[in-house]
Amino acid sequence: MTELQRVIKYLAIAFAIVLAVSIVFGIIGGIGMIFGLGKDGNDMLLEESIDINVSQAITSLDIEVEAAELKIVEGDSFSLSSNIKDLRVNEKNGVLSISQKHKNVTKIGIHTSKAGEIVLTVPSGVSFDKVEIDARAGDINISALVANKVSFDFGAGKVSIDHIEVTDWADIDTGAGMLAIGDGSIKNLDLDLGVGKTVLKASLVGRSDIDCGVGATELKLLGNREDYTLIVNSGIGSISIDGDYANGNSTFGNGANVVNIDGGVGSIDITFEND
């Protein structure tokens, strides 16, 4: 791919994301104003969060959030609370499924000031087989998560994960906003970034692919530099590895853990931190 082709590619990505968001909210607003469809967002919410019964034999999570704040916190046992009236909760074969029936929007398609909230408490030290989160809009805060496999599809909002451990594979896609991972270990990471800032501090085990979009990316790789092989393509932005800039297509190191980085539009800063 030539330099001009890379420029066109990443500018097209940025434009497509902005255009898609504008179209979605434009359609929602137009339908609401013309036909008067949709409830007031506050009618979809309770005055206070209520507790929802869940079993203690949960092995996987499947969460779909339309427009709400999602929190996953540590505690002594599994518990779930929410102020969303039409929240759907189902358990089957150890899989806890949580989804929203309606979006929290007004008749003109703008989110209300009163946000929906979902709080899932997970016992400290529990390990899931698979965790799937599909969040279209809203902030996500996860204190700690351990799983064999994770599949995250984040839309618009801020995502903060304090600690994460993935032992098999992880597939993470972001839209517009910020992604911050504070600590952990991730095996075979496939990270596809959209528009916004990303800060990732973790050990990356196996083979990882990071496709950067538009914005600044900070990778703080836990372990020694000798543990990694970095294969980088700077795109039309800049890549810094421990303060040294990499241009074009380059390979650094010969460690067992391979990280393939495709630069986008913006800066990528890679550093190493010993445990």
What are these regions (language model features)?
Residues 1-41:
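Gram-positive cell-envelope targeting signals
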Residues 111, 161-164, 168-275:
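Short, surface-exposed interaction patches in beta-rich subdomains
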Residues 29-101, 111-134, 139-151, 160, ...:
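Short linear S-[DN]-x-LW-Φ motif typified by the pepsin-like aspartic protease active-site region
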Residues 6, 88, 101-103, 136, ...:
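Arginine residue identity/basic-tract feature
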Residues 106-108:
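Membrane-embedded segments
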Residues 6-9, 13, 35, 129, ...:
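Polar/charged alpha-helical tracts
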